[in-house]
Amino acid sequence: MLASRRAEAEALGVPPDLIEDVLRRVMRESYSSENDKGFKTLCPSLRPVVIVGGGGQMGRLFEKMLALSGYQVRILEQHDWDRAADIVADAGMVIVSVPIHVTEQVIGKLPPLPKDCILVDLASVKNGPLQAMLAAHDGPVLGLHPMFGPDSGSLAKQVVVWCDGRKPEAYQWFLEQIQVWGARLHRISAVEHDQNMAFIQALRHFATFAYGLHLAEENVQLEQLLALSSPIYRLELAMVGRLFAQDPQLYADIIMSSERNLALIKRYYKRFGEAIELLEQGDKQAFIDSFRKVEHWFGDYAQRFQSESRVLLRQANDNRQ
């Protein structure tokens, strides 16, 4: 749709970027409006949904989306464990949304669930929790990882990764319900998920943490950095600051969730040192050769990312105070 509207705009002499921006804003507002009015109920016969840890931010988001879709939702928090068996006795689905470092422990503590109950977790690591759910429950099991923060406002175009545990035919409707909310689904095995998250989350968050720590130790003047920054540096600085506005326990859990993450970070540290050696030696040609090697590895993605980032930078610059 966007491509055809851009073509029409260009034919009429109207800036295509302007039309695309207006259409995207309309689409965002449409999803936001649905967030207020509600969504279609794909499984009206579903018994109550229990969210374990529903008082947390992601748990509250799923409670909201499920309630807007017409489902009855119950919350099971830490102080409710003495009533846990009663709360889940007739549950049609149980969603575990607790900190990573206690996810497997909480799954293991769950009382027996109805045999047809769908057991779901929302942790950002998948293999351990998925195995824990398969061991704790004989019924349908599904691993989810929402690839966005609970402050997103809307699930429109957000990615939700899913890992099959058991009996996918029983939870297929829930995946479709998530699509009704506007999200995009991506299926992957739990092992592959965790391997990729080592790069997407653990390494990236650690590098951001280290950069923020360096800025703080150097005691730079943030106001001056912002006043002097280019759009791309301002955006990068915003991403660093965003990390430190969130829960440190969450990021400690993500980064330290496996020995594999530590090994990857150590390899990154080693390559950082190798790059510094190029500077110490003043070897510009070696630097350029390494640069070209990485450019070749990125291939067509380099140009694609440049185009995408150009749009983001324009938007960031437009929003500059």
Per-region residue spans from a language model:
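Long amphipathic alpha-helical segments
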Residues: M1-L12, R24, R28-S30
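A short, basic/flexible loop-to-alpha-helix module at the beginning of a structural domain
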Residues: M27-R47, D82-A85
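Conserved N-terminal Rossmann-fold NAD(P)-binding element of oxidoreductases
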Residues: V49-G53
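Hydrophobic/small residue at the entry helix of a nucleotide-binding pocket
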Residues: Q57-M58
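Rossmann-fold NAD(P) dinucleotide-binding segment
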Residues: A85-M133
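Rossmann-fold dinucleotide-binding core
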Residues: V125-I188, D194-M197
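Active-site-proximal catalytic alpha-helix in oxidoreductases
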Residues: Q158, Q172, H193-A245
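Interdomain hinge/lid region at the active-site interface
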Residues: L226-Y301
